[in-house]
UniProtKB/Swiss-Prot annotation:
Region (G4) location: 559-562
Keywords: Cytoplasm, GTP-binding, Initiation factor, Nucleotide-binding, Protein biosynthesis
Residue segments, region G5: 595-597
Name assigned to this protein: Translation initiation factor IF-2
Native species: Chlorobium limicola (strain DSM 245 / NBRC 103803 / 6330)
Lineage: Bacteria, Pseudomonadati, Chlorobiota, Chlorobiia, Chlorobiales
Annotated region described as G3, given as residue ranges: 505-508
Subcellular location: Cytoplasm
Gene designation per UniProt: infB
G1: annotated segments: 458-465
Length: 952
């Protein structure tokens, strides 16, 4: 028996299914343990199975726990289903019994009509059961009904059904009672005195509600139609209280179901029935009483008491009125108000307003518990934001195991933890948002029509700058490298109608995505230029997406229509596929066919642009008393003038001498110039101006804000610089630690270090964004330094120390830097078109990639005879089936489709001669290196590994 257990085999896939893990994981583990298995269908012995279960013990425990939880859940569900089924059966039986109780008397009477006569049962209510004091209590009790529990359950469960069939059943019973052959003695009811102040009500009274129908019983040949509860309805015993609570509970459960029936039609029906039911009856003498009506009718069940000494209209209450009153009572118990639709609407509106008020209050409370803080804030700053003392913050840090001082910077995780300890939620913002300057609201009298800001977008060489050149009547294209605009330019022009328009010329190629996005943020209208002899390019679609995301209207200009190969209709079709449907085709985008070289359609294009601007009603604040602000469009470093930035004014007037802050730098306006270099005294809204007076180079997209004094501007800039400096320091330290950990874990990653120097800040950002995209898991670009201006000796020394290359974009090194670079044998490259930079860097990174290995099949051989050679081993006599085998080929030995060897050929012979290759159709002899288990019928596959150059 023990031998059979040891010899028992287990399939890997079955073991994986039992452990609820991937069969590939089990197969990989078996291979690591030295098991000789080929696939998940392979078999393993008992020892290997125990090793597998030991390795995947956690998974086994999880599977067992999951199965236990699932079984327990199934048992609970089964128990609940059984209880629900039993409850449902009881309720169904009770409903059937109660339903038969209301229907069976009539059926029974029909069957027994020839034998047992119908008897009308009249019950007299004693005077002591109904008194004036009890009648007063009726007004105070919502539902003073004393019914047996099964009857109340039937009323609660079958309220709707009873309401619909009550009138018909009672009518049938009334007819049957009236047609009785046997005379029944009628006992007059005594008149019940009632107080004069008690009004006549349409709702069913206590006596009416005391009547209940039960299962019919034949007593002495008589059919009992109804019974009257003779117990006092005003009993204050515990049993009465318990029944009252149960009744209210049942009514509450049915309230939601009955609400759907409370509509205006019920109200109209009740009003109509009341109008038709109230009839004038003759007054009766005081000694007489009303004739008793059969049990089961509404009149006998709950007759309203009469007022003495007065003749008054008494409504003849019918079944519809009773049903409506019952529903109204139940509705009142559920606090649903009246049944009118107007009352319901007011009630719902009140509930909605209360919910909205609660939600707004909760939102305000949640906002009060959110602290907006910059990363690396100090305990003192954090304490001011949360309304606590710095001492409390430091003590909390000590309790958390962090020893800090009052001015020490805290990292992001520490700030979140401390805020959570004080009941706040930390929301991190940038240093500019934290120190944002409050802008005064614009006064309506200061708002005037301003010139529109137009951005020209499109693909490379589609004619954007040529269009602007024709409008400005100056040759701007001649100064651009390869006809490609290298950085954003802002220009103000005056068209024929003496109206001013500000143009932003953005680069069209993909590398300047961020610059184009900034152009879309400050622009009012976009002119999308597409060449008629080309097609809609990816950069064109990208420009469309930027404009749509910014909510900027688009005017399409189809350029180069003067060329013979121009096809404007094709461009319109492609634009419609991109979501831009022109007006000619029923869309909302204006379109104009132009020729920027010959000036065809330019005037019409300007008219459409101005018409779009008039529709938008573009206005700006032209007040000279407010502090102006604008957007930094572009910045550059001039050798003689220093930092020069192109600013697009948004509100107010920029004047010479104004102190300002822009991003992390500040300054004082020393000079203002237009795009042609002419000095001006001030600049208003939508006017581009070149500003001199910056202390440092600002970044494109920063907001320039005029401050009240130099001191305020300097303080604000210093606060931003401290936060930015701390952020950069922490980030560089974290990057170094992360890189060390990554290199230890994954091995050394190949990096191409470089230093970038360019003429403008926008060009640097575009280059950095483009270069950082060229990377994968093995190689990447590491920019160790970037700056504006010429290449200096410091840049060369940094490149030599970090083994980096230097890229100069439209800048050159000085004399000393050039000599030092030649001495250090550094690679310094100069470019004027950004495409060339990206292409060269991509090629360099591809060269750093390890080659990709591919297997190339050469041929296959079949072993037809095996020879035993002394001192060599087994040699296979093979027949070349296909392809070709070489002496240095790698081979794979297959037996019955299963690979059992993968290695190198040791010898390749034809007859007794060693050969280098054997073609198909020839016989040869082979021997395998370090392997001689060759059998007849084996297949030998020959292949080789080919290295292929990889691409990013």
């Amino acid at each position: 028996m023990a031998i059979e257990e040891m010899e028992k085999k287990y399939r890997i896939s079955d073991i994986a299914r039992e452990l609820q893990v991937s069969p590939q994981e089990v197969l990989q583990f078996v291979k690591l343990e030295g098991g000789k298995v080929a696939s998940t269908s392979s078999m393993v012995d008992q020892g290997m199975r125990e090793l597998i279960f030991g390795h995947f013990s956690n998974e086994k425990k999880m599977v067992d726990e999951t199965m236990k939880i699932r079984q327990e859940k199934q048992r609970r569900l089964s128990r609940l289903e059984e209880q629900s089924r039993k409850t449902y059966e009881k309720e169904r039986q009770l409903k059937e019994t109660l339903h038969s109780a209301s229907v069976a008397p009539a059926v029974h009477e029909e069957k027994k009509e020839p034998v047992v006569p119908e008897v009308r049962l009249v019950v007299s209510v004693p005077d002591e059961l109904v008194s004036s004091e009890k009648v007063e209590e009726i007004e105070q009790i919502e539902q003073p009904v004393q019914l047996e529990q099964p009857v109340m359950a039937a009323q609660a469960d079958q309220t709707d059904q009873t309401d619909q069939t009550d009138q018909a059943d009672q009518a049938d019973r009334t007819d049957q009672v009236i047609q009785t052959d046997q005379p029944v003695q009628e006992e007059p009811l005594e008149e019940v005195p009632a107080p004069k102040e008690m009004p006549v009500k349409e709702e069913p009274s206590v006596n009416e509600q005391l009547v209940s129908f039960e299962t019919p019983k034949n007593i002495g040949g008589l059919t009992v139609i109804g019974t009257l509860d003779m117990h006092s309805p005003f009993d204050r015993s515990s049993e009465a209280e318990r029944k009252k609570k149960n009744r209210k509970k049942n009514f509450k459960e049915q309230a939601d179901a009955l609400k759907s029936e409370f509509d205006t039609t019920v109200k109209e029906e009740v009003a109509a029935d009341e109008k038709g039911a109230v009839k004038k009856k003759p007054a009766k003498p005081p000694g007489e009483t009303n004739a008793a009506t059969p049990a089961g009718t509404a009149s006998t069940a709950g007759a309203q008491p009469l007022k003495k000494g007065k003749k008054k209209k008494k409504p003849d209450v019918n079944d519809k009125v009773i049903s409506a009153n019952i529903r109204t009572t139940i509705s009142g118990m559920d606090d649903s108000g009246g049944t009118g639709s107007r009352q319901k609407f007011r009630k719902l509106r009140k509930i909605e307003r209360e919910r909205e008020s609660e939600a707004a209050e909760a939102f305000r409370e949640s906002q009060q518990m959110i602290v907006r803080v910059t990363e690396y804030a100090s305990p003192h700053e954090l304490a001011d934001l949360m309304g606590v003392t710095a001492k409390d913050i430091i003590q909390k840090c000590f309790s958390l195991g962090k020893f800090v001082t009052i001015n020490q910077r805290l990292d992001k995780e520490s700030i979140e933890l401390i805020a959570l300890e004080f009941g706040f939620e930390a929301e991190f913002i940038s240093e500019v948002e934290a120190t944002a300057v409050l802008i005064e609201a614009d006064e309506p009298e200061d708002m005037q029509i301003r010139p529109p800001v137009i951005t020209i977008m499109g693909h490379v060489d589609h004619g954007k700058t040529s269009l602007l050149d024709y409008i400005r009547n100056s040759n701007v294209v001649a100064g651009e490298s390869g006809g490609i605009t290298q950085h954003i330019g802002a220009y103000e022009v005056t068209v024929e109608s003496d109206r001013k328009i500000t143009f932003l010329d953005t680069p069209g190629h993909e590398a300047f995505t961020a610059m184009r996005a900034r152009g879309a943020q400050v622009t009012d209208i976009v002119i999308l230029v597409v060449a008629a002899d080309d097609s809609v390019m990816p950069q064109t679609i990208e420009a469309i997406n930027h404009a749509k995301a910014a909510g900027v209207p688009i005017v399409v200009a189809i350029n180069k229509v003067d060329k013979p190969e121009a096809n404007p209709e094709k461009i319109k079709t492609q634009l419609s596929e991109a979501g831009v449907l022109v007006e000619e085709w029923g869309g909302e985008y204006q379109c104009q066919e132009i020729s920027a070289k010959k000036g065809i359609g330019i005037a019409e294009l300007m008219e459409k642009v101005l018409a779009e601007a008039e529709i938008r009603e573009l206005k700006g604040n032209f007040s000279r008393e407010i502090n102006a602000n604008g957007i930094i469009v572009e910045s550059e470093l001039d050798k003689g003038k220093g930092v020069i930035s192109t600013v697009l004014v948004q509100r107010g007037f920029l004047k010479i001498g104004d102190p300002f802050v822009a991003g992390n730098t500040m300054g004082k306006i020393r000079a203002l110039m237009d795009e042609r270099g002419k000095r001006i005294l001030f600049a208003g809204p939508s006017q581009p101006v070149r500003v001199l007076g910056f202390e440092e180079l600002p970044q494109s997209g920063d907001v320039l804000t005029v401050m009240s004094s130099d001191r305020d501007a300097r303080d604000l800039a210093q606060k931003r610089q401290v936060i930015r400096r701390e952020h950069e320091f922490r980030r560089s330290t974290r990057v170094k630690l992360d890189s060390i950990a990554r290199q230890i874990k994954e091995g050394l990653m190949k990096e191409l270090s470089m230093i970038i120097k360019a003429d403008t800040d926008g060009s640097i950002q575009a280059l950095a964004d483009g270069l950082m995209k060229i990377q994968n898991e093995e190689v990447k670009v590491q920019i160790i330094h970037q700056g504006v201006g010429q290449i200096t000796e410091t840049d060369v020394l940094l490149a030599a120390a970090s083994d980096a290359i230097i890229i100069g974009f439209r800048v050159r090194p000085n004399v000393n830097a050039k000599k030092l670079a030649e001495k250090e044998d550094l690679d310094v490259r100069f470019y004027s078109v950004i495409y060339h930079v990206l292409e060269d860097v991509e090629k360099a990174l591809e060269g750093m990639l390890s080659p990709e290995l591919h297997e190339e099949s050469l041929g296959s051989l079949e072993v037809r005879q095996v020879f035993r050679v002394p001192k060599v081993g087994n040699v296979g006599g093979c027949y070349m089936l296909e392809g070709k085998v070489f002496r240095d080929s790698k081979v794979r030995l297959l037996r019955e489709g299963v690979q059992i060897y993968d290695g190198q050929l040791d010898a390749l012979r034809r007859f007794k001669d060693d050969v280098k290759e054997v073609d198909a159709g020839y016989e040869c002899g082979i021997s395998l290196k370090n392997y001689d288990d060759i059998k007849v019928g084996d297949i030998v596959e020959a292949y080789r590994i080919v290295e292929k150059k990889r691409k990013l």
